[in-house]
A protein has these predicted regions:
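Flexible, compositionally biased loop and terminal segments
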Residues: 1-193
């Protein structure tokens, strides 16, 4: 995160655990959840970054969900890098949750079926994503040598550039980060044009 701050990045999303990962055996999942809770607590205690949980918190164990909410509350007044902490996150789930939220909001307001149909568009759905109000990512760095998105920020990454790195996350070095930034800087972003 310090590396991101050094070059002026304002929003970072760290994907720590997918919704698919929640199906892992308890003996694998529980230690991961404790590491995530400790990591989020450590990030919040620094009071250096704004912690923003991203994911289906209702699918997480209570202790993990509470750790994420507490980190968000602890850093609410911090002025600095926004760190989206994606835990219990799946891109498809996010889009479904956004559409449900949008429909519930307009149903509660008494909107007709025709009115509901007219507001199902890119802008209105984006306003209900977990990352609402944030810019879409310019660059997505995927560690571990895997060359797939695995459902990461499906909606938001429509025009993102991707960089795949062989290093696993714990071994990801500053030189790896700078290579990704350099590769991104050399690209000609066309946004579909």
């Amino acid at each position: 995160l310090d590396w991101c701050e050094e070059i002026g990045i304002e929003v970072v999303t760290l994907w720590l655990l997918s919704t698919d990962n929640l199906a892992r055996p308890k003996n694998e999942l529980d230690p991961l959840l404790r590491i995530i809770e400790d990591t989020v607590c450590d990030l919040a205690d620094k009071k250096k970054w704004v912690i923003h949980p991203v994911g289906a918190l209702n699918m997480l164990p209570e202790a993990t969900s509470q750790a994420l909410v507490k980190a968000q509350e602890t850093t609410a007044d911090v002025k600095g890098l926004i760190v989206n902490v994606a835990v219990g996150y799946g891109g498809r789930r996010e889009v479904v949750d956004a559409v449900k939220s949008l429909l519930q909001e307009h149903h509660a307001a008494g909107s007709s079926l025709e009115e509901l149909a007219s507001i199902i568009d890119i802008e209105h759905i984006a306003d209900h994503l977990y990352t609402k109000g944030q810019p879409d990512p310019d660059l997505v760095i995927r560690t571990s040598g895997e060359q797939r998105l695995s459902g990461f920020l499906l909606w938001q990454s429509a025009h993102s550039e991707f960089y795949f790195c062989e290093a696993y996350w714990p071994n990801f070095r500053k030189v790896d980060f700078l290579r990704a930034i350099r590769a991104f800087g050399a690209r000609n972003r066309r946004y579909g044009v």
